Swiss-Prot record:
Segments in the Extracellular topological domain: 115-117, 161-200, 252-268, 327-354, 412-427, 475-494, 566-999
PROSITE patterns, per database record: STAS
Annotated ranges, domain STAS: 541-796
Protein's name in the database: Testis anion transporter 1
Length: 999
């Protein structure tokens, strides 16, 4: 009660206090972050030096700490023997060792009865003692009891059928004593022992090799459900095998597929011959052990069960030595064994090739049984086991037992449970049990010959029944995880019906299949933003989540491989309303066989080929386009998006629109391809000496210009409102080669469709795989990789609001305001208009220092101004209120780069310039009050200078126009970038531009 109160007060104390963090930093992409922060290389300790020589590698790779860790890994007993607590653990280990030793003696005696192989009992004893010592030194489980396990040894029946030493009567359950008088009996018996020894030797070699090669990781792929199901199936096999001792009858023993059903049928047939005394002794033992569970002994705060197994074995052994009972015991079986001890010999290596399959199945079954049992015990006591070390330990145990002509050893399910519940805490209990077993078998073997087999069967069944409790937990497991429940049922049914070896293989294969399905059936979530936070969640989970206009965020919840990358592709295309359409035949023909007449008619589709270099390959075979595209210009869109998408012209166009993502490769070719781009994409503008069109013509000219040039986020563009796609790779730790190819194709397809793809939260290993596989190109650069999802969203919003859009400034403030915290609203929103006007300039400075230097903005700026002047004058005369609030505190020189580049204005004195500007300001309102815009007279030839007042009035009008900043920033970047740049980066003085086709 006091603990609950303290927890409640703790929770109340910290839930009432809101924790707020406020972080101000730059938006980082992967390229900028790597430039500002140096990666840590291989160093020696805390010294920041590069390890370049072999001596440095040896010095840094070898240390006293690493040596100790290696020794503790190879010899785990050094860890617990140095920390052993004698006062707390000694009594429990002694009692557990005595109980296990006394149980192991009769189990060794009746081993021949269950495995149907007459193995000398002293050979089993010596091999079990040596194996226990080896596992204490090399094993990692503290409560494991190593020794013979009859279910594993029973798998050798298929081997013994090839060389039966008593005509197979022992396997069939009929003991004919006359067989032992045959002269060839001893020869056949020695051959069968050699077969067992060779199989055990090869099993040990396989297990030792698996441990050396680190194959223990395979056990980690088996979930807890598969381990629980396999142990439950083993427990059920044990119960069925003990029916021989419980009923006191002998039946023919089967091993292999469907053997479980065959054995049940045989027991049902022999049930009328059951021994009632054996059944009564079995019930007595089970009741006594059940009562013992209610008796608890505590020693130094550690619970210890009363050693009832020790009392039952000693009591019934003493009772049967005084009173004759009509029940089955091991005395008859011991009399049938011709030798009590066989000296160690080398296995017969000539028959190893004949037992490879049997050795493989035995090695897998014994290894998995040991590892799964050790993991279950270790989880109960809150420590970890080393699967590779256990494989090495059990391999050494089987190698040693093969020289004693003994069967395969593994962890015993019943003895391990007895050692655990009797109070054993460390492997010292296993040493005590092995010593007790050796002492009793050497000195008092005959004392246990009269122990009833039913009593031993009751002890074994009482300790393995708890493993069947997993069957009762199936409904709850189904509610928790259906995949785990299916794995449990498949493992259990296959191990029961097909045997432990085949069932294990089926369980492994099915578990791998389920894990593969679950890992590759990845979830692609569409994320939205929690308002006023940098938290992004699934749009279907929370009501408060809002979608960011124009930005689609997709989160990949697992690794991306060749299996699920197509699912990701279809999901993204579906959410963005795009479909994959093959090129039509006429479009392909137009693309590659366009005639010169068609080029002359439509100069917007003119493609220039450099014959000195090879034509770049078409990167996107199938063009990603919108289903509701305009039919009249589909060929133009195909040429732009599919053919010129990998060329220089489209490359420069996209870089003008997205200055943040300028790659290093494109910077080298941007100056060379600028003239070609100008010819290929600029519309047919009127010459300078032609009269300006009226307002209606200006509007149609602007519309045709917007249709001819791919203007982002416009209604006439062949795309919807989505301008940025963000892929959240924070949960992705691996991308294979095929997935990289598909991702690159996706990025190029969206790049050609004028949609920017950003990737956020990439792990370092994923970035390295991108770099190794040449993932980055024109469609996706390293500058498009952001450290966090919020960085990518901020970049997408700044890119959106720095260009003309359909949103008003109020809507822009509302959208951007949601990305700031409450504490930043007052400070940041006041400068929102200033920041939106300079976003591209700042982005170009971050993306590439030479971006403003490489662009050539001064070549056709005056021409663009002449086209824009009629529209601006018409808007001013009609009283249109744009309400863009772009009256910034900037100089006129910063707003109008054209005035700076005019040599005649710059040559005038300042006083004369100011007086002329004041005169123009007084005459300007008269111009604005005119109801209609009259056509201006035809300008004079370029050689004659224009009158100064008229030119200054045009310059002033352009500087005061709000759209001037937008279109200048969109096409060439704002003039602030030129004013801030060093003197050598300022563009040259602009000259009049003559079109080649002007009249």
């Amino acid at each position: 009660m006091q603990t609950e109160r303290s927890l409640q007060s703790f929770s109340n104390r910290y839930t009432q206090i809101p924790f707020v963090y406020d972080v101000k930093r730059s938006v980082y992409n992967e390229e900028n972050f790597q430039q500002e922060h140096r990666k840590k290389g291989p160093t020696s300790g805390n010294v920041d030096i590069d390890i370049t020589t072999f001596k440095h590698h040896v010095q840094c790779g070898c240390s006293w700490h690493k040596f100790l860790r290696c020794m503790l890994t190879v010899f785990p007993f050094l860890e617990w023997i140095c920390l052993y607590r004698f006062k707390d653990w000694l009594l429990g280990d002694l009692l557990a060792g005595l109980s296990v030793g006394l149980v192991q003696v009769p189990q060794g005696l009746i081993l021949s009865l269950l495995t149907r192989q007459l193995i000398p009992p002293l050979n089993v004893t010596y091999a079990a003692f040596c194996s226990s010592v080896i596992y204490v030194i090399f094993g990692s489980c503290h409560q494991m009891s190593i020794g013979p396990f009859f279910l594993v040894s029973a798998l050798m029946i298929n081997v013994l059928k090839d060389r039966p030493f008593n005509n197979g009567h022992l396997i069939l359950g009929t003991f004919v004593k006359d067989d032992f008088s045959v002269p060839t009996f001893y020869l056949s018996y020695n051959r069968s022992l050699s077969m067992v020894a060779s199989t055990t030797f090869l099993t040990g070699i396989i297990q030792l090799s698996m441990g050396m090669l680190g194959m223990g990781f395979m056990a980690t792929y088996l979930p807890e459900a598969a381990t629980s199901a396999y142990l439950a199936a083993v427990a059920l096999h044990i119960i069925l095998a003990q029916m021989t001792c419980i009923l006191g009858i002998m039946v023919s023993f089967h091993a292999g597929p469907i053997s479980f059903i065959y054995n049940i049928i045989n027991y049902c047939i022999a049930l009328p011959k059951a021994n009632s005394t054996s059944i009564l002794l079995f019930i007595t033992s089970v009741v006594a052990l059940r009562i013992n569970k209610c008796i608890r002994i505590t020693f130094n705060r550690y619970p210890i069960e009363f050693p009832m197994e020790l009392l039952l074995i000693l009591g019934f052994s003493l009772l049967t030595s005084k009173i004759t009972m009509a029940t089955e015991n091991s005395k008859m079986l011991m009399n049938m064994i011709p030798y009590s001890f066989v000296f160690p010999e080398n296995p017969e290596f000539g028959i190893l090739s004949r037992v490879v399959l049997q050795a493989l199945s035995l090695s897998f079954v014994s290894s998995f049984l040991l590892i799964s049992l050790g993991k279950k015990i270790a989880n109960f006591h809150n420590y970890r086991t080393n699967s590779n070390q256990d494989l090495i330990a059990i391999g050494l145990c089987n190698l040693l037992s093969s020289f004693f002509k003994c069967c395969v050893f593994t962890g015993s399910l019943s003895r391990t449970t007895i050692q655990d519940k009797s109070g054993g805490r460390q492997q010292f209990a296993s040493l005590v049990g092995a010593g007790v077993m050796l002492l009793l078998m050497v000195k008092m073997e005959s004392f246990f010959h009269n122990l009833p087999n039913a009593v031993l069967a009751g002890i074994i069944l009482s300790n393995v029944v708890p493993y069947l409790e997993a069957i009762y937990n199936l409904p709850s497991l189904w509610r928790q995880d259906q995949y785990e429940c299916i794995i449990w049922m498949v493992t259990f049914s296959s191990a029961i019906l097909l045997g432990l070896d085949v069932g294990l293989l089926i369980s492994l294969a099915f578990t791998f299949f389920v894990i593969t399905i679950r890992s590759h059936r990845t979830k692609i979530l569409v994320l939205g933003q929690i308002p006023n936070t940098n938290i992004y969640r699934n749009v279907n989970d929370y009501r408060e989540v809002i979608l960011i206009p124009g930005v689609k965020i997709f989160q990949c919840c697992s690794s991306i491989t060749f299996v699920n990358v197509y699912h990701l592709k279809q999901k993204v295309l579906k959410e963005v309303n795009m479909v994959k359409l093959p090129l039509k035949e006429e479009e392909i023909y137009t693309l590659f066989h366009e005639s010169e007449t068609s080029i002359a008619e439509n100069k917007l589709c003119r493609c220039f080929c450099d014959c000195e270099e090879l034509e770049p390959e078409i990167r996107v075979v199938y063009t990603e386009r919108y289903e509701n595209r305009q039919e009249q210009d589909s060929s133009i869109n195909l040429i732009r998006c599919s053919y010129l998408g990998s060329g220089d012209s489209s490359q420069v166009t996209s870089e003008e629109q997205i200055p943040y993502t300028v790659s290093s490769t494109s910077q080298r070719n941007i100056v060379q391809s600028y003239e070609d781009t100008e010819k290929a994409w600029l519309p047919n503008s009127p010459p300078r000496n032609s009269p300006l069109p009226p307002p209606e013509a200006s509007e149609s000219l602007a519309q045709s210009r917007s249709r001819s040039i791919i203007m982002p986020y416009s209604d006439t563009s062949v795309q919807n409102n989505t301008h940025t796609i963000i892929l959240d790779f924070s949960m992705v730790h691996y991308v294979d080669n095929r997935a990289l190819v598909i991702l690159r194709q996706m990025c190029n397809a969206f790049y050609n469709a004028n949609i920017l793809v950003l990737i956020s939260g990439c792990h370092t290993s994923v970035v390295k795989s991108f770099e190794k596989n040449d993932f980055f190109d024109e469609g996706i650069t390293k500058a498009q990789l952001f450290l966090s999802l919020h960085d990518a969203v901020l970049f997408a919003l700044s890119r959106k609001f720095s260009e003309p859009s359909d949103l008003s400034m109020d809507e822009t403030e509302t959208v951007i305001q949601e990305t700031y915290s409450e504490s930043d609203k007052n400070g940041n929103l006041s400068n929102l208009r200033l920041k939106t006007g300079k976003a591209i300039i700042e982005g170009s400075q971050h993306a590439s220092p030479g971006f403003t230097k490489n662009l050539k903005p001064g070549k056709d700026d005056l021409e663009f101004d002449l086209e824009l002047d009629p529209m601006l004058s018409f808007e001013q005369s009609s009283g249109m209120d744009l309400n863009l609030d772009l009256d910034l505190d900037l100089d006129q020189s910063e707003l109008d780069p054209g005035s700076e580049l005019d040599s005649e204005i710059q040559a005038k004195p300042e006083l004369e310039l100011e007086s002329e500007l004041e005169t123009d300001a007084q005459t300007e309102p008269e111009t604005e009050e005119e109801p209609e815009l009259e056509p201006e007279p035809e300008p004079e030839p370029e050689t004659e200078p224009e009158p100064e007042p008229e030119r200054e009035r045009k310059t002033r009008t352009r500087s005061q126009s709000p759209w001037r900043n937008y279109f200048t920033a969109y096409r060439f970047g704002s003039s602030n970038s030129q004013s801030r740049a060093p003197p050598q980066t300022r563009p040259e003085k602009r000259k009049p531009h003559n079109y080649p086709n002007s009249p």
